[in-house]
Amino acid sequence: MKLKVGFIYGGISTEHEISVISALQAMNNVDKEKYEIIPIYISKNGEFYTGNDLLKIENYKNLKELCKKSNNVAIIKKGNEYCLLKVDFPHKILSTIDIFFPIVHGYNVEDGSIVGYLETIGAPYAESDLYASAVGQDKVIQKILFKENGIKVAPYIYFYENDFINNESDILKQVKDLTYPVIVKPARLGSSVGITIAKNENDVKNAIKEALKYDEKILVEKVVDNLKELNCSVLGDKDSYKASLIEEVTSSKDILSFEDKYLNGGKTKGMASADRIIPANISKNITKEIEEISLKACKLLNTCGIVRIDYLLDTKTNDVYLNEINIIPGSLSFYLWKDMSHKNLLTNIIELGIKKYKNKSRKQSSFESNVLQNFNGTKGVKK
């Protein structure tokens, strides 16, 4: 019997469209002999939909019409089953789901919001858990964690919107102390949205204004000199991680834009469309160092499934800086696994999710006590 896999994608996110592309790539390449595909699309206003019309990329040209053709659903638990309940009257169960596969990108979805709900109802799911997802979405928390554990990160500062409003001159001085040029980022977004390189104080002010459109938490980093951008994917869980080939991302620009990452090769290719050299033109020593850092970073976060870790290399000093980890990478980084088919990669991710669920099911999730039986009024409330 085929396992029913509910692919969750879309959502209230600046990376909504990229999530759609990544999910459709996965649904088109998953092993159809092992798995039954159930699309679960989250609209831009946060409603969940399912239906066969969601499987065709051309239907996403008109999202309003697509949602009308599809069934509005809610993910629920009924008994021991996880179901898609039709929201509109008459209510009915449209499908059961054996395992969920979130392929979501960005704030509000990839940050643990989706897997947090799945955890709440006890549902099995592929990819990393709530904790890794939350840390993976916040570039500042990542840097603090990695630096504390001996992994190099580029010099940086961070602040919140109110900090800048109340202490602009102090923050601008901290930025200047990093030395220009710097890169200004929303701390909890991805896909290069809201990111700007600033070469002077006026640039910094404009860059902060742009980044604040997307997030109240801002990260400013020193631009690495003699820069070469490198990416490495990691597959597995805490028991066994494996690093992919390392790619060198090429661009004539100072920084890869959203368009560079996703649209250069056509609107259906996702991250696979970016200009890249695989394997990267780097020494064996640098390759080994990046692989070792990647496995260490994944162990620290206890990632599961597939992730991508982005690096900055100073080609003059050979210093390697971990830039950020992507908990659910665009296109699931399938293009970095030349020795594994897209189909087998997806099977591996799903099987890791099943293993994670089985391991967690063995742990006690409740504690027997008679507190409620003896509870009388509010006297027993913890103060």
Where are these regions (language model features)?
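A long amphipathic alpha-helix within ATP-dependent nucleotide-binding catalytic cores
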Residues: E210-K217, Y262-D314
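C-terminal active-site "lid" helix and adjoining low-complexity regulatory extension at the edge
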Residues: N285, T315-K383
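ATP-binding N-terminal substructure of ATP-dependent carboxylate-amine bond-forming enzymes
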Residues: M1-Y131, V135-Q137, I141, Y160-S169
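Flexible, glycine/charged-enriched surface loops at secondary-structure junctions
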Residues: L219-K222, C304-R308, N359-S365
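Short beta-strand-to-turn element immediately C-terminal to the catalytic PLP-Schiff-base lysine
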Residues: F159, I195-N200, V234-D237, D314, ...
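Active-site nucleotide/adenylate-binding loops and adjacent lid/helix of ATP-dependent enzymes
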Residues: L3-Y9, S13-N28, P90-L94, V135-N226
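Phosphate-binding site of ATP-dependent enzymes
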Residues: K199-G270, N281, N285, V320
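Glycine-rich phosphate/pyrophosphate-binding beta-alpha loops
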Residues: G106, S192, S252-I255, N326-K338
